[in-house]
Amino acid sequence: MSFSPLIRQLIESLRILPGVGQKSAQRMALMLLERDRSGGLKLAQALTAAMEGVGHCRQCRTLSEEELCPQCADPRRDDSLLCVVEGPLDVFAVEQTGYRGRYFVLKGHLSPLDGLGPEAIGIPELDARIRDGAFSEVILATNPTVEGEATAHYIAQLLADRGLTLSRIAHGVPLGGELELVDGGTLAHALAGRRPIS
């Protein structure tokens, strides 16, 4: 079956979403056109508004509709702590823990195979933010992947002589998890990162 040019354009546009392949995009496009045109128009309006109205916070670089995001605009936050994360969703996740320091959002992680070096993910901007701030501790909260670990290591090397406390988020057995269900790599990290009981 051959789709009309407008339907093909809609399908191709939907395919830019993560995890959406050709078949899923076709199903979504046809569902919107056949069953929920008002929902499709509402989606188009919300997408246009977000693309035009959402930018990046000038301090931490998370997504924001204002020049400063709510976390950077809050004077009650701890200016001595800086948490470095890979993306805006990570800020949301860390906020759920009650963390009250500042953030810096990278644009992903180092990935030379994908052409993502230090400049592409914002390491020079991080360096400038740390130089301009009054931070005493930098928390490296990149993901526990090979690329996330490499990114944390690179940043730690860059900041090693600054007189800052550098810390890495812990990895290991999830709270409430059972050891027999934990994979070997995760358990090895948990054992290597063990700490004394006080």
UniProtKB/Swiss-Prot annotation:
SMART domains: TOPRIM. It comes from the Bacteria. A zinc finger (C4-type) spans 57-72. Disulfide bonds: none annotated. Keywords: DNA damage, DNA recombination, DNA repair, Metal-binding, Zinc, Zinc-finger. GO terms for molecular function: DNA binding; zinc ion binding. GO terms for biological process: DNA recombination; DNA repair. Residues 80-174 form the Toprim domain. May play a role in DNA repair. It seems to be involved in an RecBC-independent recombinational process of DNA repair. It may act with RecF and RecO. Belongs to the RecR family. This is Recombination protein RecR. The lineage of its organism: Bacteria, Pseudomonadati, Pseudomonadota, Gammaproteobacteria, Pseudomonadales. The gene is recR.
